[in-house]
A protein has these predicted regions:
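Pre-Walker A (Motif I) flank of P-loop NTPase domains
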Residues: 2-5
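Walker A (P-loop) phosphate-binding loop of P-loop NTPases
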Residues: 13
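Hydrophobic anchor at the beta1->P-loop junction of P-loop NTPases
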Residues: 8
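NTP-dependent small-molecule kinase module
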Residues: 22-26, 151-227
């Protein structure tokens, strides 16, 4: 039985974490995660994140987000994210997918391309190779990109309280990150779906629901294919 990996991406303050949780609640309220789907298969709904989706990852998350910016070199940062992902894929994602779970993941490989590639200016080819190594080729079935102007998102994020290490970066960095997400969406239109995150929280949630409805038939045909 095969599960689904659905990723939520976006710049700081785009609302992706809020929307991921609302999506989880909606799926469970509609029978997923607590019963049988339309094909009689049990589909648990699980929520995870990168970095920090495993015990090892929690330590890496603290180092990456709470540490002082000048103490972590860009290539070191890239390798730490790759280490977190490699552990996450083997310890959590693959086992959950084998159980047929619908996984909602807060950030995945596209974030590394956008932040460390476009934002930090590291080699995109190198990042793509590291992503392949870390994931073993595991890609998302769907990535929801919550598209929000970088300046607006950064203001939202900083209003939450003390800015983390990534949020402390200047606006130019976050604009490059936004450009990276836009380029990825243009390059992979079947996998990455753009959501206008400038709309109200409820409007964004309804837009995500509609995307799920459009893809349910395709997804479940995949889920029940022979192993």
């Amino acid at each position: 039985m095969h599960g689904l990996l659905i990723v939520f991406e976006g710049v700081e303050g785009s609302g992706k974490t809020t929307q991921l949780q609302r999506c989880s609640d909606w799926l469970q309220a509609n029978g997923m995660g607590s019963g049988l789907d339309v094909f009689g298969k049990h589909r648990p709904v699980v929520v995870t994140r990168e970095p920090g989706g495993t015990s090892l990852g929690l330590g890496l998350r603290k180092l990456l987000l709470e540490g002082h910016s000048s103490l972590i070199q860009d290539r070191t940062e890239l390798l730490l994210y790759a280490a977190d992902r490699a552990q996450h894929v083997e310890e959590f994602l693959k086992p959950q997918l084998a159980l047929g779970a619908i996984i909602l993941c807060d950030r995945y490989t596209d974030s590394t391309i956008a932040y460390q590639g476009y934002g930090r200016g590291l080699s995109l080819h190198l990042i793509q190779q590291l992503n392949k190594i870390a994931t073993g080729g595991l890609e998302s079935d769907l990535t929801l990109w919550l598209d929000l102007d970088a300046e607006t998102g950064l203001k939202r994020a900083r209003q939450r309280g003390t800015a983390d290490r990534i949020e402390q970066a200047d606006l130019a960095f976050h604009r490059r990150v936004q450009q990276g997400f836009a380029q990825l969406a243009a390059s992979y239109p079947q996998r990455i779906v753009r959501i206008d995150a400038s709309k109200s929280e409820q409007e964004v949630h309804l837009a995500i629901q509609e995307i799920f409805r459009q893809r349910f038939s395709e997804w479940f045909q995949k889920l029940i294919r022979p192993s």
